[in-house]
Each structure stands twice: as C-alpha cells, then as structure tokens.
C-alpha cells in the first residue's frame, strides 16, 4: 500500500494543448491520471502552472509542473500509504505553501491526488466509485442526469452567441442507458435541423462536441433545441440547461452585460446591452417560453448583489455557481452566507486536490444544494469524474455532447457502472436534490 514510484509526463489534451499526466506505482500496479484544463477560467481558480516559454507550445507547456512532480512532490510521497488521501493531499498543499497552489501548480498536485485515490481503490479491491463512496461516507449511490452541451457559444465558439452552453438534460428517462440514448437521438435530430437551416458547415463541432451554428442569439439557439427535442419525440422528457458564463460578456466599467459582445459595433442592437434587472428579465422570459431547468453563471463572478437578487426572486431555477465558486469551500461558504445561488459546479482542477473537492461537495449537500460534476473544455481520456459523480451521489454531470471520444469516455464509463450496479436508481426529476 506504500508508494514505490511517482512519475509525471507532458501529454496533449483534446485541444492539442499540453497537460500533465501522473503515474503512481504501488505493489498493486501502476495508476495513471490525466488533468484537464478550461477555456473560460474563473479568476478565483487555483493556478494551472504553465511554462510561459513562447517558443514552445505558445507558452502553454507544462514541463515545470512535470518537474515539480518528479523532483519535489514525488520524492515526498515515496513510502507513504495511499489509503491516507486527506493526509497526503494536505502534505502536498503544505509543500506548495501558497493559497492558490501557484508554486507547484494545481495541475501537478491534482494529478498526484487522483492517482493516489486510484491506487487506494486497488488496494481495497474496489471499483473507483465504490472506494470514493466509502472514503467520503456516502451510503447511497444514484446514476446522474447527464447534461449534454449541444449548442456552443461564448468563448467556445466563433458565432455571435454571447452565452456559452445550451444543454439537453433527459430528466424523463428511467435509467442512465435510456438517458444517453435519448440525448444521442436528439443530438442527431439537432444535426439534421441545423444542416437544413444553416448548411453543412454549421454542423462542424466545437471543443465539447456541440454545434456552433451562426445563430443571432439565445432564443434562436433555444428554438433549435425545442425543435430537435420534438423531432426526436422527447418533448416533456428532456429539459434544457444553460451555462451563460456571464463574466465573459460583463463590462466592469459600465457594470452592464453585453449580449451582443461578439457582434460588430455597427451591426449591434443597443438593446442587447443589459443592466442586472434587464438580464434577470431576459432569463425569466426564457423560462416562460422554454423548458429551462438550470442556469449556470448567470452573472459575473463577483457581481454578488445580482446573484442574490436572482436567487431570492427566482430560486425555482437551479442557479449554478461555477466561476462564482470555483469548487472552493471558502467561496461556497460566502455564497451560502449571501444566498447567492442554490447549486455548485464541481471541477476538480479548479481547486487542485480531491480532499478539498470532497469538502465542497459535502457542504453543498448538507445545505440541500444541487451538485453537478463537470469536465473542462480541454479534456483527456481520463474518466475519473464519472466514478466521482456516482460515488459522491452528485446526481448531475456535464461532460459535453454525445460526440468526441474525450467526452464519450465519461458517458460510457457511467453505462458500465450502471450495468455493474444493476438496480441503481436514476436521479431523473429528482436531480437537484443532492444528498450527503
């Protein structure tokens, strides 16, 4: 059960950018984890260490992070017991010594943290999801509702859409296998609808496997989704979730939100620039006309007053904090104190250790918040989050469209888990009630 070897290397993610992979060897074998990275990153996230050498990968290399594992973290882990997850995570945090993992890199630390956990699961002879449940004291497990990002905008696409993700969520399915089939069929129908309206080029896919047709705005994107859902025969069984990533179209100086940020100034309708009340009215109007269940990052990451107003007045929506919370227990506590949202997005690389991730999830579950596990736009073949979402009973996951292998590997792993567990319940309409 003690660590015999730690080795890191630089690999490429799904966007062709470097990322880090860490291997930990024990008497049970070798355990490997790959770390993802995001495109729209919150300013409060832990530091993803990049080399900054413009002559190599445009400055995005991770050789420093690799070296930190191989020369600093690795030697400190040798001989340690992999069953002591919290102790080893704490040791790595202290080894770094900063409050944002800026010295060694959250990417370096997380790769080690995940591989330690995998090694421990093997030590116990358990599948990863069962070990994660045992490690965190979760007695119940539920198959999550998958949220598929099928229309892309914002930082993920070259169209005029300011908001970043439009997702389909099969809450009316009876099990995970059926949910995946419903989404895949709807995705294929969406492709047909988009091709007919915008031409073949509009069916090219973005970083997360979704389409990026040249729509004029959110309503046009939502109309496409409703049409595709109806065409697939799933009206009333598939709901819609949005990730607005509003920090990306917020103007710090004017304190306004520009829904036409990506439209040339001479062609832009001035009414697309909204104050907080105007943007809230926009969201409420979407909710009246479309089956919208969940809205992520509806406001900028430090516009606390707007978050509070929306949550107090319109908490019937699931209001998800991503850039606002960055999977950080301290930020989650602030949001609870300010009543700023009612759900948390979990991205393990935003915080950099599993122990801190577990703490964030526990806080949210004890408060009765929704918990949604998430991929990043720069992904790998690593399936850790699929086991995490089941083991910690999160009930929701978003990991892209049913397209591109780095997305599908997570969904396929969830199908394997459901098959293995047999009669495990599916979250369905109960997806917002995460339980500790």
Curated annotation (Swiss-Prot):
Mg(2+) 2 binds at residues 243, 296, 322. Signal peptide: none annotated. The keyword Ribosomal protein does not apply. Its main location: cytoplasm. It holds the Pfam family Enolase_N. It is found in: Cytoplasm; Nucleus. Pathway: Carbohydrate degradation; glycolysis; pyruvate from D-glyceraldehyde 3-phosphate: step 4/5. Disulfide bonds join 147-169. It is an enzyme of class 4 (lyase). (2R)-2-phosphoglycerate binds at residues 164, 208, 322, 376-377. One of its GO terms (biological process) is glycolytic process. Its EC number is 4.2.1.11. Mg(2+) 1 binds at residue 40. Belongs to the enolase family. HAMAP family: Enolase. Homodimer. Homotetramer. Interacts with methyltransferase METH; the interaction inhibits METH catalytic activity; 2-phosphoglycerate binding to ENO prevents the interaction with METH. NCBIfam families: eno (TIGR01060). Glycolytic enzyme that catalyzes the conversion of 2-phosphoglycerate to phosphoenolpyruvate. Inhibits tRNA methyltransferase METH catalytic activity in the absence of 2-phosphoglycerate. PANTHER family: ENOLASE. This is Enolase 1. The lineage of its organism: Eukaryota, Amoebozoa, Evosea, Archamoebae, Mastigamoebida.
């Amino acid at each position: 059960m003690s660590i015999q070897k730690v080795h890191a290397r630089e690999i490429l993610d799904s966007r062709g950018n470097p990322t880090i992979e860490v291997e930990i060897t024990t008497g049970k074998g070798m355990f490997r984890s790959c770390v993802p990275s995001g495109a729209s990153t919150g300013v409060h996230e832990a530091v993803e260490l990049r080399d900054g050498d413009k002559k190599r990968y445009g400055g995005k290399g991770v050789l420093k992070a690799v070296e930190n594992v191989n020369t600093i973290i690795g030697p400190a882990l040798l001989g340690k017991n992999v069953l002591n997850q919290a102790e080893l995570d704490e040791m790595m945090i202290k080894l770094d010594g900063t409050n944002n993992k800026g010295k060694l890199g959250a990417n370096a630390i997380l790769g080690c943290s995940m591989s330690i956990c995998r090694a421990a699961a093997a030590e116990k002879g358990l599948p990863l999801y069962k070990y994660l449940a045992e490690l965190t004291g979760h007695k119940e497990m539920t198959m999550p509702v998958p949220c598929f990002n099928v229309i892309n905008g914002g930082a993920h696409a070259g169209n005029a859409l300011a908001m970043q993700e439009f997702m389909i969520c099969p809450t009316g399915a009876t099990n995970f296998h059926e949910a995946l089939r419903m989404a895949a069929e709807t995705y294929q129908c969406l492709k047909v609808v988009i091709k007919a309206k915008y031409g073949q080029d509009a069916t090219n896919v973005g970083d997360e496997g979704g389409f990026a047709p040249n729509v004029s705005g959110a309503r046009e994107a939502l109309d496409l989704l409703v049409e595709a859902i109806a065409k697939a025969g799933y009206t009333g069984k598939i709901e819609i979730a949005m990730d607005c990533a509003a920090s990306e179209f917020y103007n710090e100086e004017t304190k306004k939100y520009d829904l036409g940020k990506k439209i040339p100034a001479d062609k832009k309708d001035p009414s697309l620039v909204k104050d907080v009340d105007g943007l809230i009215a926009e969201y409420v109007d979407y909710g009246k006309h479309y089956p919208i269940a969940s809205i992520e990052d509806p406001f900028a990451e430090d516009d606390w007053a707007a978050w509070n107003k929306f949550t107090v007045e319109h908490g019937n929506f699931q209001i998800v904090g991503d850039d606002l919370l960055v999977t950080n227990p301290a930020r989650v506590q602030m949001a609870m104190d300010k009543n700023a949202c009612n759900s948390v997005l979990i991205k393990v690389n935003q915080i950099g250790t599993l122990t801190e991730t577990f703490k964030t999830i526990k806080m949210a579950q004890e408060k009765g918040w929704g918990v949604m596990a998430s991929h990043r736009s720069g992904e790998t073949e690593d399936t850790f989050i699929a086991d995490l979402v089941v083991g910690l009973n999160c009930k929701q996951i978003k990991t892209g469209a049913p397209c591109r292998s780095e997305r599908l590997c997570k969904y396929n792993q969830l199908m394997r888990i459901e098959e293995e567990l047999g009669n495990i319940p599916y979250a369905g309409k109960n997806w917002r009630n995460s339980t500790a």
